[in-house]
Amino acid sequence: MLRTLVTFLLLALASVAFAEDGARSEFTDSRDGRVYRTVEIGGQVWFAENLAYAAKGSFCYGGAAKGCSERLYPKDVAEKACPAGWRLPSNDDFQKLYGYAGKTGVRSVGNALKAKSGWDRNGNGFDDFGFDAKPAGYCESRKKCEYRDCFLSMWSSTENISWSLYCVDEDFNKGTYSKTAALSVRCIKE
């Protein structure tokens, strides 16, 4: 009982301590009129959802050219996909997000960034900061896609580096992919 109370109090204090972060807003992409939710985390302003702009060379999970709410991008397309005033985050940007989200010490970074719903295998998170990371899968090629409801990997601008969340893992992991793999994009404000 005491342990539960202490955990609850720590969560409440963490929520208050980080209340000034998590400032939410919206951004309208002038290229297609789509409105994106944004959130400030640790002094950085991020899209609070995956990019869905239909840049040439991007595609929907499974290879379709259109008709989806989010898209996957090979590395060369990802590097130019964010709208004016926004950019593909660097490895340093992701490291800063990781460090900030890990400061609470109450739960894992992955669970703090994952959305509260949408993940298979009981992989939902707590979305402590409004990042709202939802699974989108990835594609090794246009027709070879996997893990739609269990995996999110986001390109960084740093050579072949991506950051990923898994439904069966509570961390936020740095990894590498071939430049031809198609991953999600989260834009960060310049």
Predicted feature descriptions by range:
Residues T4-L13:
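Sec-dependent N-terminal signal peptides
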Residues E20-E190:
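Conserved positions within compact, well-structured domain cores
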